[in-house]
Design a protein with these regions (language model features):
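Glycine-centered hinge/linker elements that transmit conformational signals in sensory
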Residues: 184-191, 226-257, 299, 303
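Short, solvent-exposed loop/beta-turn-alpha elements that line the ligand-binding surface or hinge
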Residues: 111-127, 201, 218-238, 287-293, ...
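Conserved N-terminal structural module of periplasmic/extracytoplasmic solute-binding proteins
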Residues: 2-109, 115, 119-122, 256, ...
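Extracytoplasmic/periplasmic substrate-recognition and gating elements
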Residues: 56, 147, 151, 162, ...
Length: 434
């Protein structure tokens, strides 16, 4: 990506000399115009740890205060939508979950980073990172209303989340397939003391996040390439049955109520053998010496393969983007470049942030401290899937997650749950113009 726009040769030379000596550079102050502060809307939780950790360094070196306004996940989404609809210049930068990109991109609420600030791809950052921040999407089905729009980079990943797999490496080798996951779970499952597999089964988002990598590996999907609903296809139904029949049989009781914090806690206290996992759970709980009894015993790998012959991780990146209404776009763009630079990314990762640079994820010393980094690097290199790129995804996820949860709780059969979900999603998408 281009780091300096519209500077003189002498200025660039001077700044390059400064970079050789210091772990940062401050282009806004070099240009002579800078705001007193930048306001960043951020999600509360582990995802913002790294950002908060490097903030004092940025403030000291730039002279610009960072006002990081943290909000719970659902509150952040609602606040951003209402702010953008009002055209308010409340935030200079925002953190957005990658499934929000279709909504924000369709509504044209974000400033293109490529055409406005000259951002270009950095070879040290996996291409999928740029793809997930691009709208309309560069691969997969494109919403009907977006097909004629030019593609632009609207966000840059600051939290390199990809859903992976964790298992007790002191108890067995790494599973290569979901069949091995189930076989190992049956061998090690001891009801009341050791769960063979922890299903993250809470309704709506949690169960969908747990299920999609399984669905894809079984050859199923929510939509096909033409936006036809296929969640009730034979391959998709096999995946649903694997979740609610097979995996549930080796899961803790009450699987329909378990969320991410519950599964991480069970792994940390030694009462679970394996499950899917997000990087934030690893740093916050599973590998946290203050709460975990299993440090050094848990292995991390990309998602196991299914009947399709391939495993599919799922993107869960948090991106930094600049609202169109921001009055400090140039300073915001400079901050994005600063915080994603190699030196700052190392400090960011050391403070618990989840990086996306290959050089950081494959660094030997960093891997010694962060045992999931190698799996994350492999997961990114394998090009993980993202959730369907439609502005209707929140509603689709609610429908799918509600019906999957009902099946997991024994309130509906897998057949009835998938049929009901498919019918409701088809009606939703038809109304939305698909």
């Amino acid at each position: 990506m281009k780091r300096w726009v519209g500077w003189s040769v002498l200025t660039v030379v001077a700044v390059l000399a400064l970079v050789a000596l210091l772990p940062s550079w401050v282009p806004v102050s070099a240009q002579g115009a800078k705001p007193a502060k930048l306001v960043i809307a951020a999600v509360a939780g582990n995802e913002s740890l790294g950002l908060k950790a490097v903030a004092p360094t940025y403030e000291r070196e730039s002279g610009i205060k960072l006002d990081i306004v943290e909000m719970p996940y659902p509150t952040l989404y609602e606040k951003l939508v209402t702010t953008f609809q009002a055209g308010a210049a409340t935030y200079d930068l925002i953190m957005l979950d990658d499934p929000w990109m279709p909504k924000f991109g369709t509504e044209e609420w974000l400033t293109p980073l490529d055409s406005t600030y000259g951002f270009k791809r950095d070879p040290d950052i996996p291409g999928v990172i740029y793809d997930v921040g691009t709208w309309p999407p560069p691969r997969g089905p494109v919403p009907p209303s977006e097909k004629s729009k030019p593609k632009h980079l609207l966000g840059i990943t600051v939290v390199g989340n990809v859903e992976m797999f964790m298992y007790r490496k002191d108890l067995s080798p790494a599973p290569k397939s979901w069949d091995e996951v189930l076989a190992n779970a049956k061998k090690l499952n001891k009801p009341g003391s050791m769960a063979g597999y922890v299903v993250r089964g809470a309704a709506t988002n949690p169960i969908v996040a747990d299920f999609l990598p399984i669905l894809w590996s079984f050859g199923g999907d929510v939509f096909d390439a033409s936006w036809n609903v296929v969640i009730d296809s034979p391959a998709s139904l096999r995946a649903v049955k694997f979740l609610v029949n097979d995996l549930k049989s080796v899961a803790p009781s009450g699987a329909e109520n378990i969320d991410a914090a519950d599964r991480s806690r069970l792994m940390a206290i030694g009462q679970a053998y394996q499950s899917t996992v997000w990087p934030g759970e690893v740093t916050g709980i599973v590998e946290n010496p203050k709460v975990s009894k299993t440090i050094g015993k848990v292995g991390y790998i990309p998602m196991p393969a299914g009947p399709s012959g391939k495993g599919y991780g799922m993107m869960g990146n948090w991106l930094l983007a600049i609202p169109k209404a921001s009055k400090n776009g140039r300073a915001g763009a400079d901050f994005i470049v600063w915080v994603t630079s190699p030196k700052v990314q190392k400090a960011y990762a050391e403070a618990g942030g989840i990086p996306s640079r290959t050089s950081i994820l494959t660094d030997t010393a960093m891997n010694d401290k962060n045992p999931y980094f190698a799996a994350l690097a492999k997961s990114l290199d394998a090009v993980p899937n993202w959730r369907p790129r439609t502005d209707q995804w929140n509603a689709v996820e609610t429908i799918l997650g509600t019906n999957l949860n009902a099946a997991l709780a024994g309130l509906a059969t897998p057949e009835d749950a998938t049929k009901k979900a498919a019918t409701e999603i088809r009606a939703l998408m038809k109304k939305a113009g698909y």
